[in-house]
Amino acid sequence: MAGLMVSGTQVSYVGQSCREIPEHLGRDFGHFAKRLDLSFNLLRSLEGLSAFRSLEELILDNNLLGDDLVLPGLPHLHTLTLNKNQITDLEYLLDHLAEVTPSLEYLSLLGNVACPNELVNLEKDEEDYKRYRCFVLHKLPKLKFLDAQKVTRQEREEALVRGAFMKVVKPKASSEEEKAAAPENQPQYTPLPSGSRDLTSHRGVLGKGRYFYYGRNSEGNRFIRDDQL
C-alpha cells in the first residue's frame, strides 16, 4: 500500500494527507506496533489510536492537532513528538499526558504556540522558554528530554521549587492568526521519497542552548538517550 512502511514493530504512514487514523492501520498492526509515525498528515483527531495499546514511540509531527487532543491510555509510551501542530493550551496537554502516558520520558512540542521560543514567535525570548521548561517538568517530572534537550539536575530542582508558579498563559489568537491557522493556509510539506526513508534511522530535531532545528523533511523528533551519549 502506497505510503505505508512496516519494519519489525515499526509502522510508518507519513505524508498521506489523512484527516483521521485509517482503520486498517489499527486492525492490521495495532496488536504488535511499538513505534508509530503519522507525521506530515492532516490529523485533527487521534480516534483509532486505542488499537495501538503497546506503543512505546509515537510521532505526530506536522499535523493539525489542537487543544482538543485526546490520547487513549498508553501505559508503555516513553516517546511522544508533537512538533508543528496547533497546540496552545500547555497546561491542559500536560495534565492529559500525566494521566494517560505515565511512562513518558521524551517529549517534544517545538513549533506549537504552547512552546514559546524565538524561532516561532519573535516576541518570546530565552526566559520565556526557561519558564516553559520549568512548568513542563513540574507537571511531568519523569521527563529525561524535552524538545531534544536533556533535562538537567538543576532544571529538576528548580521545577520542584518554582514549577507551580511558572504557568504559561494561553495566548489569545487574533483574527489574523486564526485565519493563518486555517488548513487551506497551512504549508504543504513533502516527505522524503520512500526509497530514502529508513524506519530505523534517527533523523530529527537537535537543540543546543536556545537554538533549534526542526526541518520540513524531518520524519519525527529523535532523541539521544543516555546509552548513546
Swiss-Prot record:
Residues 121-162 form the LRRCT domain. Pfam families: LRR_9 (PF14580). PROSITE patterns: LRR. InterPro entries: Leu-rich_rpt, LRMDA, LRR_dom_sf. Keywords: Differentiation, Leucine-rich repeat, Repeat. LRR repeats lie at residues 32-53, 54-75, 76-97. It comes from the Eukaryota. GO terms for biological process: melanocyte differentiation. PANTHER family: LEUCINE-RICH MELANOCYTE DIFFERENTIATION-ASSOCIATED PROTEIN. Required for melanocyte differentiation. This is Leucine-rich melanocyte differentiation-associated protein. The lineage of its organism: Eukaryota, Metazoa, Chordata, Craniata, Vertebrata.
